[in-house]
Amino acid sequence: MIKKYFFSFFAFLFLLVGCSNEEVNIVKKHEVIEIGIVGEIPSLIKENNIKFKKIMLQDLHKKNEDPFDAIMITKDYLQEASDKQYTQFYLNSSIPIVFVQSDKAISAFIIPNHTYENTFENQAQDYFIGYYQGTTFGVALNGNTNEDLIKGYWSLFDLLDRLKQTNN
């Protein structure tokens, strides 16, 4: 009898949570993560511990990246970001470089003479791909809803937070 009530309670709870129309609110506890971003700041990320600061692609190799925990380059700037003048910056950066919504593989950005046009497709179809001190990484989305996008950003922020902790 107790098992029946126990099962019914959890089935009801599961249905109640599954049918919610509430806005996704994923609360994570991170230290402050500061990201230099080339492109638009994501409007879905509103937490106070995630700080974005707009930067210009042309200024990447002129700037000291120390104030940032990572640099993000959004889809509209990927073709230009694959120019060989930036390759050494990505390879030598002391912080992770993240490319958002790239249709191409990471090699477009980190291998000299590869460009966005002549590099093969991103077969993994990761939403975020990146490079950090000899390591490439990717974060995929589980779907194409705002909730999936927010969860993808949080997976990326978790990764960046771990990299930050490892580097300190």
What are these regions (language model features)?
Residues 1-5:
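Positively charged n-region of N-terminal signal peptides that target proteins for export
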Residues 15-18:
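C-terminal motif of bacterial Sec signal peptides marking the signal peptidase cleavage site
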Residues 20-22:
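Bacterial signal peptide processing site
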Residues 26-27, 31-37:
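Residues that mark the start of a beta-strand
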Residues 37-67:
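A short, well-structured beta->alpha microelement
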Residues 37-38, 71-75, 98-101:
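Conserved beta-strand segments of the P-loop GTPase G domain that flank and frequently precede/overlap
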Residues 42, 84-168:
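Extracytoplasmic electrostatic interaction patches
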Residues 64-79:
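Short, well-ordered secondary-structure micro-motifs within conserved domains or adaptor modules
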